[in-house]
Amino acid sequence: MIQMQSRLDVADNTGARSVMCIKVLGGSKRRYAGIGDIIKVSVKDAAPRGRVKKGEVYSAVVVRTAKGVRRPDGSLVKFDSNAAVLLNNKLEPIGTRIFGPVTRELRGERFMKIVSLAPEVL
């Protein structure tokens, strides 16, 4: 459950280490984002020679949340932290590698590239 001002880890190799959610996309009154939702983020901490710089604004897709996601069989998949993958204007991942597991819920949407790059799909 991500809202404005939420800090997230970055699960790709773009050079960003942490980002802050500045907007949840998908309606003017939308308050929360879950796994698979697109948000606008500002880079808060970046590696010195990374592809992105501190202060830049990007779209991102949420790939892990501490709140978790409920499956139709009743199981709940939770993670230790919130994480996102940075996207370009065409909603394709900017990085070429994904770190850590992602959930199967990303497969049904338009993020097959992220699922194929991920080392583990839960």
From Swiss-Prot:
Belongs to the universal ribosomal protein uL14 family. SUPFAM superfamilies: Ribosomal protein L14. GO terms for molecular function: large ribosomal subunit rRNA binding; structural constituent of ribosome. The gene is rplN. Keywords: Ribonucleoprotein, Ribosomal protein, RNA-binding, rRNA-binding. The keyword Nucleus does not apply. InterPro entries: Ribosomal_uL14, Ribosomal_uL14_bac-type, Ribosomal_uL14_CS, Ribosomal_uL14_sf. This is Large ribosomal subunit protein uL14. HAMAP family: Ribosomal_uL14. It comes from Methylobacillus flagellatus (strain ATCC 51484 / DSM 6875 / VKM B-1610 / KT). One of its GO terms (cellular component) is cytosolic large ribosomal subunit. GO terms for biological process: translation. Binds to 23S rRNA. Forms part of two intersubunit bridges in the 70S ribosome. The lineage of its organism: Bacteria, Pseudomonadati, Pseudomonadota, Betaproteobacteria, Nitrosomonadales. Part of the 50S ribosomal subunit. Forms a cluster with proteins L3 and L19. In the 70S ribosome, L14 and L19 interact and together make contacts with the 16S rRNA in bridges B5 and B8.
